[in-house]
C-alpha cells in the first residue's frame, strides 16, 4: 500500500483569486487540461513509482474546484494501481489552509512500513512488523553507497531543496560524459507522467471511472 500527497493552502484565499501568480494555474488557456494535479499531484505520483520501483497501471480520479471561477481543479483525490498490483492513494490540494508544503509518502508492505516528509527531509521513519520505529538520518554511515553519494553536507546539517536538485544536474552531466548517471529522471518518466495527467482528467470527467494510465507504447 502506498499513500502519498502533495497539498498546501497557498491558493485557498478566494479574495486572492485574481492574483496573476495564482489565476493562470486554473486557466485552461495557460495551464492546459489540469490544474493542481498537473502542478503538484503528479510529483507525488512519480515519487510513488520511483520509491516502489513499480509503474502506475491504472487510476481513478475525483477533481474539485472549490474557489468560484476556477475552470480547473484545485483539489484532487486519486486512487491508483501499479503494474504489480500495489494499491495507491493520493491527495493533492492547493486549498488545504494550514499546510505549507505537504509533500510526503508512506509505503506499507509485508515486513513493515516507512514514511518520509519533505518538511523533515533528513529523516526516513521505518517500522518493522512487531518492532520499534527506527529513524534513518541523512548522512548516516550505515546507509547505502547511493544515499551517501547524494549527501552533500555532514550529518545533522540541513541539505535543502537546491542541493537535491543539484544532484540531478550532477547526474545529468555524468550521463553526457558517458559515465553512470545514477537515478536520473528519463524521458520515459516524463511521458508516463503526462499520460497519467490525461488519464486523471479522463477519469474525473467520468465520475471516477478507472482508466489505463500508461502511455500507449507501454501497454
What do these predicted ranges mean?
Residues 1, 202-219:
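C-terminal capping/lid region of NAD(P)-dependent oxidoreductase domains
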Residues 1-70, 124, 207:
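Predominantly a Rossmann-like dinucleotide-binding segment in NAD(P)-dependent oxidoreductases
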Residues 16-21, 25, 58, 77, ...:
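C-terminal glycine/acidic-rich active-site capping loop/insertion
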Residues 44-45, 165, 169-170, 197:
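A general structural signal for well-ordered alpha-helical segments in protein cores
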Residues 52, 169-180, 198-201, 205:
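Short, hydrophobic alpha-helical segments
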Residues 54-55, 70-72, 86, 99-103:
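Glycine/proline-rich active-site loop of Rossmann-fold NAD(P)-dependent oxidoreductases
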Residues 68, 91-99:
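Glycine-rich phosphate/pyrophosphate-binding beta-alpha loops
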